[in-house]
Amino acid sequence: MKEKIRLTINGHGVEAEAGSTVLQVARQNDIYIPTLCYNEVLKPIESCRLCVVQVEGEPHFQASCGTEVQEGMVVTTDSEEIQQTRKLMLELLLKEHYGDCIAPCQLTCPAGIDIQGYIALISQGKYIEALKLIRERLPMPLTIGRVCPHFCEYKCNRNLVEEPININHLKRFVADYEMHSGKRNPPPLAEFSGRKVAIIGGGPAGLSAAHYLRRLGHGSTIFDAMPALGGMLRYGIPEYRLPKKILDWEIDGILELGNIEVKLGVKWGEDFTIESLRQEGYDAFLLAIGAWDTRKLGIVGEDLQGVWSGVDFLVDLTLEKPIEMGKNIAIIGGGNVAIDAARNSVRMGADTVTIIYRRSRDEMPASPEEIHGAEEEGVQFHFLAAPVRLFGSNGMVEKLEYVKMELGEPDASGRRRPVPMEGSETLIPVDMVIAAIGQFP
């Protein structure tokens, strides 16, 4: 049994267990002390300073959440000076941290979805209401729920207690619920304004713009160079990750909002210009052209036959164009494009598929589940390795030379910069190389 001690709070004698904090004892005796950052299951961090009290003999106010009671301690929890201090602390919090009360999961979400809100609705069985709340910020949850990197889950506060809430799958669940019900739930639409926007690009950005413009009452025409809408969602993500029937169902839902026209197989700069669209009467223009160009490796031999960009490889697969596959394939890069290219290569019959990445496994930007899936399918990984040269014969790539790396100081991204190790050059046989080191518009 813990030792009992006596102290005085606001002129009243109270008894408490040794090791308790002033805040805990006050609550046990129905004495109110305001708090903001305090959580009884977590260690006090004394961050908000709203719970300050006066302890006799101490020159400054003390945070009651982190101050242990002592025998004979005399505490004042409510005085004019204490109230003024708490008011000042609250004003400082509101002034400097206007988003302090927004959950870290929502702050991390690129779309800014009200995550707490839709999870609360799901917990009440209000699935369609949850879906409508998601669509306030994300018009394609059915699709994104299958490919989202769910940064939110890495910042979920439940990580401090056990493990994160499965935020992304809850989003996908309510979108699947609507699809399987067979009934769409369109958002409220403003009266048609008569204005029309030309949207150049039919990928996720262009489709999202058409959705929100229609909700505001404006019409749009989507112009796209490809034979079908979807952009990288359709042409850059393999079927096993994002089935085309899922994407089509969601796109159809956007087009069914009305006053959205589609023109496919037309290229900006060849078939039309901004000026020609202006002459056709469009009131505004949106460029949503995506990131289809890929970064070059910048090494000798990258112009040899058999060297592909990750985007070109995945697009040609989707379009079912003939591809002369190699047997020993090297993939350069560590993102999801690299993983997608590697897993597709395995499925197309390659003998060996090796991903070469210049940083460590922990620093790979690809989703952990995708990395694990690639390993399960037999993809090999060479971490801390960077290609320096490609060798060929008769114009065809035959060998790849890489150097081993070691991690140095962090760069601008916060990741440790890889530094080449002298004398670590290594040659491996290849007959196909796929570069997936980044994309740009």
Name each model feature, range by range:
Residues 218-234, 354-361:
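Glycine-rich FAD pyrophosphate-binding loop
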Residues 1-107, 116, 120, 124-128:
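Signature of N-terminal electron-transfer/Fe-S-associated modules in redox systems
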Residues 10, 202, 225, 334, ...:
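Cofactor-binding loop segments of dinucleotide-utilizing enzymes, especially the Rossmann-like FAD-
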Residues 139, 203-204, 228, 335-337:
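Residue-level detector of alpha-helix initiation sites
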Residues 245-296, 308-318, 322-325, 347-441:
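A Rossmann-like FAD-binding core segment of flavoenzymes
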Residues 325-332, 336-353:
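Predominantly flavin-linked oxidoreductase catalytic cores and closely associated redox partners
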Residues 196-221, 338-346:
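N-terminal Rossmann-like FAD-binding beta1-loop-alpha1 element of flavoenzymes
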Residues 94, 105, 118, 141-144, ...:
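FAD-binding core/adjacent interface of flavoenzyme oxidoreductases
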